A protein has these predicted regions:
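PLD-like (HKD) phosphodiesterase/transphosphatidyltransferase domain
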Residues: 1-65
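PLD/PLD-like phosphodiesterase catalytic module centered on the HKD motif
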Residues: 1, 9, 46-160
Length: 160
């Protein structure tokens, strides 16, 4: 077997994004994410995502996040996440990922699912792709990026 046949779920709007995102609360594996927090200006999404992070913590679902390092992201990070979560998050220099700058959402990988959410209006949407091959590849790429990520406690890039 060369590849598994992916299963794709697609939802539009804030409620659709929430419906897809809830799947990560049932994960039996670590949840890894790349976040463009600049796009989290919508209070409803911001509050929902930070609430889900608290629920995953209570359920002891491990989580690691790479966050694009911008001044807006640093402010939103403080608003959305509790201090004990900081150790499992790292900043990524956006200039090292020019193709991802401004993508406007989040990529999360858990179990055999890859979830992409696009948050800015118009065009709010999300999709979950179930594919072992895709998630194995994304997990490997995430680990490479994790190794070059900077600790959440470090000063912003423009102050280094």
């Amino acid at each position: 077997k060369i590849a598994d046949k992916p299963v794709v779920q697609y939802q539009e709007g804030v409620e659709g994004i929430k419906t897809l995102y809830l799947q990560s609360l049932e994960s039996t594996t670590e949840v890894i994410s790349i976040l463009d927090l600049d796009s989290f200006e919508i209070g409803e999404i911001k509050d929902f995502v930070s609430g889900c992070a608290r629920i995953r913590k209570k359920k002891q679902i491990k989580e690691r996040s790479l966050v694009l390092d911008t001044p807006i992201a640093r402010e939103r990070f403080k608003e959305m996440f509790h201090e004990e979560q900081f150790a499992q998050c790292r900043w990524i220099d956006p200039s090292k990922l020019p193709g991802i700058v401004g993508f406007g959402g989040m990529l999360s990988v858990f179990e055999d699912k890859a979830m992409v959410t696009i948050i800015p209006r118009p065009g709010q949407a999300g999709m979950v792709i179930e594919s072992t091959i895709l998630t194995t590849l994304l997990k490997g790429l995430f680990d490479l990026a994790w190794d070059v990520g900077r600790s959440i406690g470090v000063p912003p890039l423009h102050q280094v």
